[in-house]
Design a protein with these regions (language model features):
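A generic "binding-loop/recognition-motif" signal
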Residues: 9, 46, 72-73, 90
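Core dinuclear metal-dependent hydrolase active-site scaffold
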Residues: 1-35, 86-124
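Short, structurally constrained coil/turn elements
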Residues: 60, 79-81, 95
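Short secondary-structure boundary micro-motifs
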Residues: 3-4, 49, 70, 76-78, ...
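Active-site metal-binding motif and surrounding structural segment of the metallo-beta-lactamase
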Residues: 26-72
């Protein structure tokens, strides 16, 4: 596993089977291999945790999945990305076979979650 700090609360985790990008809104991103899926998380709607720039990543990485906190308005998601976007609520579990994500109530806004990818669990 490789963890790369991007900016503010944003970082990238690379595992054997996927990339996980957290709360990206600005900063230099490394190159992504198209062989692995890219999961993009936004923990809540504040502009230093969610920006529409994440949807530009689809052009360079077609195997992309967006997991957004329930408090982010769905109208902020471009039409071209709607099928690749899931909204996570506290108590909800999303599982696509590669990544399992469970939502928890946050102490602030948005959602905290636990990700399980091949026995690696991270809480954010």
């Amino acid at each position: 596993m490789k963890i790369t700090y991007i900016h503010h609360s944003s970082f990238l985790v690379e595992t054997e089977s996927a990339y996980l990008l957290f709360d990206y809104f600005q900063g230099k991103l490394p190159e992504f291999s198209e062989e692995k899926p890219l999961y993009v998380f936004a923990s809540h709607r504040h502009p230093d945790h969610f920006s529409k720039v994440i949807f530009d990543l689809e052009e360079k990485h077609p195997n992309i999945h967006y997991i957004l906190a329930f408090d982010i308005w769905s109208k902020r998601v471009p039409e071209s990305c709607k099928e690749k976007t899931r909204f996570l609520n506290p108590g909800q579990v999303l599982d696509d076979g590669t990544l399992k994500v469970e939502g928890f109530k946050s102490t602030a806004v948005g959602v905290a979650d636990c990700r399980d990818i091949k026995r690696l669990c991270s809480i954010y």
